[in-house]
Design a protein with these regions (language model features):
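Conserved N-terminal structural module of periplasmic/extracytoplasmic solute-binding proteins
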Residues: 3-19, 24-110, 130, 177, ...
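Immediate post-signal peptide segment of exported/extracytoplasmic ligand-binding proteins
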Residues: 33-43, 64-66, 147-149, 171, ...
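Extracytoplasmic/periplasmic substrate-recognition and gating elements
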Residues: 61, 66, 94, 172-173, ...
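Hinge/lid segment of periplasmic solute-binding proteins
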Residues: 104-161, 176, 185, 212, ...
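Short, solvent-exposed loop/beta-turn-alpha elements that line the ligand-binding surface or hinge
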Residues: 124-138, 142, 220-243, 293-310, ...
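Extracytoplasmic/periplasmic solute-binding protein
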Residues: 146-155, 161, 185-232, 276
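Glycine-centered hinge/linker elements that transmit conformational signals in sensory
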Residues: 188-190, 230-261, 315
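C-terminal capping/gating helix-and-loop segments adjacent to ligand/active sites or protein-protein/ligand interfaces
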Residues: 228-230, 323, 362-365, 379-441
């Protein structure tokens, strides 16, 4: 009997079926396989770095834990975004924008439109996102709109018109915390006469010098003229500009000798350590003091305690005004824009703001967020201050100016403080107002919506 056996017919058929299945599977994988999942990583451009980093670090860690998306923070240090804004504009002009970036609500965003090849069409309209998370139901969300559209989702509310005072320095020299401009000038000159730096502002990162002039101007001119300055519709010969400049120079004369070399964190440090009496800044300084100087107790001017070291107050003459600085997120269009939108959505949500604002020194834009989440008495006080404020304006130094106008005034204010060249400053202000109005008119935008323009003011070009 032969040892060879023939292969049975069922086996042949079965093998053929298997072969066909394998071929079909290979063809399916080659031509019909599911698309590769997009990379779970985005870049977020920001100027929060160094001593101001804890808040954004906490937010990013929270977002990554929730979504699995890695966020690379490309930080360009410099207070108020002095350097970051122009780095972002350069990326946009080169056609390589990040997936998301930090921006202030207001005309600052329009500067990015103007720098982009297709203007606002290169950015994601976030109006629907704002509706979904409820931020457009808030007062802050509404005023962040540009002619009824939201391109920046707000993540917090800062107050710019604050003065920080070292209680020990004032007590040792028999000075009561000043509540009026006249009292501030008298106190500053008295301290200067004793060889004590009174007003400690910083020249290295430019912004706190213009910031001081701005608060003086707000106190002298009032909120309506301040808003007209923002739109460039204020007469450059208005007497309030000259009066604010005169007061500014009186206070600038009491700066420490090395003020041009200081940045804003160093200026805060001087006042905290008693090497100066006053520093005018926003409540991001509250976050800095809270995260860096653990043993330093802050208190509002209305409830000074014996153990208080730093008194925080509205800048004299601006008590009823909340000078807003609103940090926000913008999203350029691109292959990963959906991830950028998701990041902006989380950051601007109640959940994101509860993570970010406590260490930042700011407060949430949502009025129903309980004040007890804030670690400092100043933030709890600011919640009430905002609720009670009669007027709201947008800070000129922090978002209410187009970038080119902002740069003119930043450098002009430092030159004014150094050389007291008032004619040059008035010329700079005149040019700045003219350019500010021209850029607003060129774009046709205004803050708010047709139904609710910011502060009830519709500029002449409003469509």
């Amino acid at each position: 009997m032969s040892l060879r056996r023939g292969v049975s017919r069922p086996v042949l058929i079965g093998g053929a079926v298997v072969l066909v299945i394998l071929i079909l599977a290979a063809l399916y994988l080659a031509f019909f396989r599911a698309p590769t999942a997009p990379p779970k990583e985005i870049t977020f451009y920001t100027w929060w770095a160094g001593l101001e980093e804890p808040a954004i670090k906490a937010l990013v860690e929270s977002y990554t834990a929730k979504t699995g998306v890695k966020v690379t923070r490309s930080a360009v240090p410099g207070g108020a975004g002095v350097n970051a804004k122009f780095a972002i504009i350069a990326l946009i002009m080169a056609g390589k924008p990040p997936e998301a970036f930090q921006v202030h609500c207001g005309p600052e965003m329009i500067s990015y439109f103007l720098a982009s090849p297709n203007k606002e069409a290169d950015f994601v309209d976030l109006t629907q996102v704002g509706k979904e998370i409820g931020v457009l139901e808030t007062a802050v969300g509404k005023v962040c709109m540009l002619s009824g559209k939201l391109y920046t989702t707000p993540v917090n509310l800062h107050r710019a018109n604050l003065i920080f005072m070292n209680k020990g320095v004032l007590d040792a020299n028999g000075i009561k915390p000043p509540r009026t401009l006249d009292e501030l000038i008298v106190a500053s000159k008295a301290l200067q006469a004793k060889g004590i730096p009174a007003m400690v502002q910083a020249g290295a990162d430019l912004f706190t010098v213009l910031h001081l002039w701005e608060q003086i101007f707000l106190a002298v001119a009032g909120p309506q003229k301040f808003i007209e300055f923002m739109y460039g519709t204020l007469d450059p010969g208005d007497p309030s500009i000259k009066r604010a400049t005169e007061i500014f120079l009186e206070l600038a004369a009491t700066f420490p000798p090395d003020w041009p070399a200081l940045d804003w964190t160093a200026a805060v440090d001087r006042v905290v350590r008693g090497l100066g009496a006053f520093h005018v800044d926003g409540d991001w300084a509250v976050g800095l003091i809270y995260t860096t100087y653990k043993d330093v107790e802050m208190c509002p001017i209305d409830s000074i305690t014996p153990t208080c070291k730093i008194i925080v107050a509205p800048f004299p003459g601006t008590e009823e005004v909340y000078n807003m600085v609103v940090d926000a997120v913008a999203v350029p269009k691109g292959p990963l824009q959906d991830l950028g939108v998701d990041f902006a959505k989380y950051f601007s949500s109640r959940e994101g703001q509860k993570v970010f604002n406590p260490p930042k020194g700011s407060i949430s834009v949502y009025p129903d967020v309980a004040p007890d989440i804030y670690p400092t008495v100043i933030q709890k006080w600011e919640v009430e201050q905002y609720r009670k404020s009669r007027y709201q304006v947008f800070s000129l130094t922090h978002g209410a100016l187009f970038s080119d106008v902002w740069q003119k005034l930043l450098t002009g204010a430092v030159i004014l403080a150094q050389y007291k060249a008032t004619d040059s400053w008035y010329s700079t202000v005149k040019d700045a107002l003219s350019l500010q109005r021209k850029l607003w008119e060129q774009t046709g935008y205004y803050l708010g919506s047709p139904e609710a323009p910011f502060a009830g003011y519709k500029p002449p070009w409003a469509r």
